[in-house]
Amino acid sequence: AGGIAEMAELGPEVRKKTDKLDAVGNTTAAVAKGFAIGSAALTALALFTAFAEEVVKSPGVSSALHGSHFVLNLLEPKIIIGLFIGGTVPFLFCAFAMEAVGKAAFEMIGEVRRQFREIPGLMEGKAKPDYARCVDISTRAAIRQMIAPGLLAVITPLIVGFGFGAQALGGMLAGVTVAGVLLAIFMANAGGAWDHA
């Protein structure tokens, strides 16, 4: 609302009201991030429990069982390998996602500069920009750049599970859960601090 009021050149009293709305919106978003992280952590734990229950039912995984329970023995090398792989996946995913945002932004900047160069009267406000082209670039870039993070999330468990077995996959899921929750809390707090600095 503040940006719209600024572009529409509305009076300072309107800007005061939109600033209050902006502050409330930022606070609400910051609080909601905590709830979102908490619900994601609980969902990950529920999925890990479902995985453990399925492993118990599956034939050929007796080495991972302790009685009728699925156990992750930290002295087992495959589990350590899985933990380290799982611990790196959230960081790789975030790196791919941040790189995607940067690439999409630079594509948009290139298009905006092209329009300023090629559309006469755009700088003076006498001509309209090609909004559809900008929307098309941002949509295509968003979809194209998120292929790598999506493939990482889908392919990694398959490689670990088929390559190293159920124990390594359990270790990977545990590593992803712990590292992912901690990284989410860190990034939410850091982003909130930078946003309100």
Swiss-Prot record:
Secretion signal, residue range per the UniProt entry: none
EC number: 7.2.3.1
Regulation of protein activity: Requires K(+) for maximal activity.
Site (Determinant of potassium dependence): A29
Membrane-topology descriptor: Multi-pass membrane protein
Annotated Gene Ontology cellular component terms: plasma membrane
GO molecular function: diphosphate hydrolysis-driven proton transmembrane transporter activity; inorganic diphosphate phosphatase activity
Pfam family membership, one: H_PPase
Record field: catalytic activity: Na(+)(in) + diphosphate + H2O = Na(+)(out) + 2 phosphate + H(+)
CC cofactor: Mg(2+)
GO biological process: sodium ion transport
PANTHER family, sorted: K(+)-INSENSITIVE PYROPHOSPHATE-ENERGIZED PROTON PUMP
Family in the record: Belongs to the H(+)-translocating pyrophosphatase (TC 3.A.10) family. K(+)-stimulated subfamily.
Free-text function comment from the UniProt entry: Sodium pump that utilizes the energy of pyrophosphate hydrolysis as the driving force for Na(+) movement across the membrane.
Name assigned to this protein: Putative K(+)-stimulated pyrophosphate-energized sodium pump
